Regions:
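A composition-driven surface/loop motif
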Residues: 1-190
């Protein structure tokens, strides 16, 4: 079991990154809890893998300190691959921000906690979702926030089952303009 927290106010880093790696990070199991904050910076990150992040199993929970102006739970400038496990990511701005994404399995929750967040899940350049259950939630019910954004989104063998509309999907942005159903869920087709 691993618990990771950014340092206290006296010695906190400027960027406020709880777990950072330049190279590839692979998580195959275990219980990992990351609580992130930044004392001297308006933005903080929970798990920041510059090159590549691969999750094959385990129970991963990433949660910000609610005093932040901006907080991104999971971010990678390269490839994000999720094959299994349970991954719960909370952010005040973006919950998940990745350049290339492939989700083939597991149970993934991305949730924005701040009403003023303009996005929940940014799978920026290309995203392919082929399995698992992927829930994207705007906890504060902001009707203007983009729940899922991708310039190239592929859903193969999975369905969007809640909270999205065809117009926004066509624009590669999945929105939900309403307060009754502030989330979308993508899961494997039966």
């Amino acid at each position: 079991d691993t618990y990771i927290k950014t340092a206290d106010e006296e010695v906190a880093s400027f960027m406020g990154v709880a777990l950072w790696t330049q190279d590839k990070m692979i998580i195959n199991g275990g219980d990992i809890a990351i609580h992130y904050t930044a004392s001297f910076s308006p933005i903080s990150y929970g798990l920041y893998s510059v090159s590549e992040l691969e999750i094959n199993g385990g129970n991963i929970h990433i949660n910000p300190d609610d005093s932040q102006l901006m907080a991104v739970g999971l971010i990678t400038s390269g490839q994000l691959t999720i094959n299994g496990g349970k991954v719960s990511v909370y952010g005040l701005d973006d919950a998940i921000n990745a350049k290339f994404t492939h989700i083939a399995g597991g149970e993934v929750l991305a949730q924005a906690l701040d009403y003023f967040a303009d996005g929940v899940c940014r799978l920026v350049t290309k995203a392919e979702i082929t399995g698992g259950v992927f829930t994207i939630s705007d906890m504060q019910h902001n009707p203007k926030s983009v729940k899922l954004f991708s310039n190239d989104l592929h859903l193969n063998g999975v369905s969007i089952v809640a909270g999205a509309n065809e117009t926004s999907v066509a624009k590669k942005e999945i929105n939900n303009y309403g307060y009754t159903d502030p989330y979308i869920r993508i899961e494997k087709e039966e």
